[in-house]
A protein has these predicted regions:
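Bacterial N-terminal signal peptides
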Residues: 13-20
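Bacterial Sec-dependent signal peptides at the C-terminal "C-region" and cleavage site
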Residues: 22-30
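Mature extracytoplasmic enzyme cores
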Residues: 30-45, 50, 65-76, 80, ...
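Aromatic-lined carbohydrate-recognition surfaces of secreted/lumenal glycan-active proteins
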Residues: 116-123, 241-248, 300-336
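Alpha-helical scaffolding within the catalytic cores
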Residues: 33-41, 65-69, 334-342, 369-380
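Substrate-binding cleft/loops of secretory-pathway carbohydrate-active enzymes
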Residues: 125-137, 249-263, 323-359
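Bacterial N-terminal signal peptides that target proteins for export
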Residues: 2-12
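Conserved small/polar residues in nucleotide/adenosyl-binding loops
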Residues: 388-392
Length: 392
């Protein structure tokens, strides 16, 4: 795991529940740990220590709705809210009306002493900006995100449709993609890889989810999502709007092994050998399969860090904002959705985890509510980095 250097001196722990609650940080300050002070703050905590719900907008939002709901939040002891668009939303996402209502919410929050935070997506997973990213940047989704394997004894007549064709020769594999016709009558073991693509859906605005491993996708996402907030709030981003929440960003395969256009190039530069002719070792236990799988997963993780986490973190640093949220279910030991979650936490100003449902389960490593492992991963990442005072 590659993280920012040094360790923080202190950590206050609190649960962040992405399904309904989130706690958030105040600016670093000298703290007195006297019991009387702690007891007083437990009885009437400042808003930085109070929960903040995901405030769902899933209809036509009105100022009267905002007045009523923020009033309810204040009455129930909340410290703020994350405006969270969900399916059913009639108010157009990122429209002038959206930002007018958002600004009204922030002003009302000031009156009530509530912090209004940004949830950075139209539902989830973060990255596609409600369909605007794929609409404006086709290469964010149309190049393929997986390689599906077909094994044959002879190259098929339509071998040209495959992205990569390998022939097994002893304990190694030869790339015959450019010359499959030569082997049409040569029996053997052939490994044929075809590109797969994320499927389109209404959830993603009629497009598909985007490939966060493609360079420039995160920057496009930030430009589309945050430009309206920048125009509307200017210097209030940071001091007033404390930060933003990313929900479930992920890098799953669209079918077969996870692939992205420059994966082979990045892999060779990092490890000094060809991943293309080693792809069968990702599904078969032969040769140096353990090394190949480790190198492959480490490459995906580092690409995810470099092309998603670092740009997001840098943007929030520039704006003086806190970046929080969580990744897709952090379901270790499965690496299907994103590799090493702890490596991702290191780039958040306020790292967090999901705690779905309300049924305690300390048995399954994939459990959400009651998952001690996930909490310890999060705390360890906070302790190992220089994020300063944190609530996790």
């Amino acid at each position: 795991m590659k993280t920012k250097p040094s360790a923080i001196k202190s950590l206050l722990a609190a649960a962040l529940a992405a399904s309904c609650l989130a706690s958030y940080a105040a600016a670093p300050q000298k703290r007195e740990m006297k019991f009387e002070k702690l007891r007083k703050e437990f009885a009437d905590p400042p808003r930085a220590f109070r929960p903040a719900p995901l405030w769902v907008w899933n209809t036509r939002v009105t100022r009267a709705d905002i007045d009523r709901m923020l009033g309810d939040f204040k009455a129930q002891g909340f410290g703020g809210a994350f405006v969270h668009p969900r399916p059913g939303l009639v108010t157009e996402y990122l429209s002038d009306e959206w930002f007018d209502l958002y600004k009204y919410s922030v002003e009302k929050g000031k009156e009530l002493g509530l912090d209004i935070w940004i949830y950075d997506e139209n539902s989830y997973p973060s990255g596609f900006a409600g369909g605007h990213v794929p609409a404006q940047m086709p290469e964010s989704y149309d190049q393929g995100q997986g390689l599906a394997l077909t094994k044959t004894a002879l190259p098929p007549a339509d071998a040209g449709k495959y992205f990569l064709c390998l022939k097994k020769e002893g304990g190694t594999f030869r790339d015959i993609t450019a010359d499959t016709g030569r082997y049409k009558d040569v029996p053997g073991e052939y490994y044929l890889y075809e590109k797969t693509y994320y499927g389109r859906s209404g959830w993603h605005g009629g497009y598909s989810y985007v490939d966060l491993l493609v360079e420039g996708v995160t920057e496009k996402f930030l430009d589309i999502t945050m430009s309206g907030y920048e125009k509307t709030f200017g210097n209030e981003l940071g001091p007033v709007i404390r930060g933003l929440f990313s929900d479930e960003p992920c890098i799953p395969s669209s079918g077969g092994v996870r692939w992205t256009p420059d994966l082979f190039e990045v892999f060779r530069k990092q490890w000094g050998y060809d991943l293309a002719t080693s792809l069968p070792l990702l599904s078969e236990q032969t040769g140096d399969w353990k090394q190949v799988r480790h190198n492959y997963l480490e490459t995906l993780t580092q690409m995810f860090v470099d092309r998603w986490a670092k740009p997001m973190s840098a943007y929030c640093d520039r704006k003086g904002m806190l970046w929080t949220g969580h990744y897709w279910e952090h379901d270790w030991p499965s690496m299907y959705q994103g590799g090493d979650n702890m490596a991702m936490y290191a780039w958040h100003q306020m790292p967090a985890i999901d705690m779905l449902f309300n049924q305690y389960n300390d048995q399954s490593p994939q459990a959400q509510f009651g998952n001690v492992r996930a909490v310890k991963e999060l705390r360890s990442a906070a302790n190992q980095t220089e994020i300063g005072r944190a609530h996790v």
